[in-house]
């Protein structure tokens, strides 16, 4: 685990040397700020549910950008061979890359806590921290899953652009497509499919409901994609 943390620190530091990271941060925070301000009404009941729901859609486009170079860049520059010659195994590399990207996302998300302070100061009759805390937990779980998917896509190619496009396609398929289809096709099958999607499972968190089944879903799904990424790296080692 120590070796993974070392890689994570290196990865996190590399984000702040990239102009793309600052562009992503600016766009994400400006969009969140606009959505919060548009929904905020002083003197009304404090709520961040609408902002949290919009964040999920934003992550479909944001996460692929911050995860596209996690492994694809290493393959393109040839540094993956150097990385794998030191006493590291594939699991160390994958966990380190994941934790580094996840760490950057927490930095990206942290400024939005200012909105909680604003709600606490100006909302009536006060602020209920339960739904807000569960909403943040849900966003963190969704981001973890999306980063693991982005990391997996990055392990399949040497091109960062291809990795980003592939990640967007996968995230669109598991998040937006079922929701859109369920609104167009009225059938029990698509209704059941929609109930199992990422967005549907996340909405429980945004309403203040922490369901064990949803926790298991996000954690296990993230673990599956990390496992698949490890297997891809192992297969590349023997080529």
Predicted regions and their residues:
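Aromatic- and glycine-rich beta-strand/loop motifs that create alpha-glucan
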Residues: 1-21
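Terminal transmembrane helical anchor/hairpin motif
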Residues: 40-45, 163-232, 239
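Residue-level recognition of transmembrane alpha-helices
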Residues: 97-98, 135, 167-168
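Hydrophobic/aromatic residues in alpha-helical transmembrane segments
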Residues: 63-67, 115, 148-149, 198, ...
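Helix-loop-helix units of permease transmembrane domains in multi-pass membrane transporters
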Residues: 70-100
